[in-house]
């Protein structure tokens, strides 16, 4: 069944402590992460893992750690636990985009994240694929609030035939935002005001929520990537 689950649902949006262990950890702990990963015993080690479902961790940036080799950030998840996120792209030219987009207070959304132990003993997430991560210009609290509004509006749109209200002044709406196709407005003036006041940030979040709403999180079919760095 397609549709975006509640972002507080830890089955699809786990906290760091619940993430599956990456291949490096599994050299220390031969553990099967049944909720996330299926293991094929007939294949060689490190080539025998495939996702059972889609999942994504949300991590708000609290500090930039200045490493000379790659971008590394101190982050917190929805439980408040802090850990590291390291960007390990093969294409190092993308690191300038990472530095430009990743700001303290913004939220990293990392698909298919796994727990990694770094050489210094710290734990975190190692992001190797550019399409695995999305940077949203909102805090975790703002992300949850926008998601709640989005999910409520999807249900309301299915149930109601009433004319939608302008997102700025609440008069009857005449057109939608061309970017997210979700926020509605009675006039160009109201749309311009709302963009400057709130929607510039919300629009990016709503577009991502809309993409996540289009597939079934319970069943892994194809890799669901994101386009910030691809």
Where do the PLM segments sit?
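Short alpha-helical interaction motifs and adjacent low-complexity tails used for partner binding
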Residues: 1-230
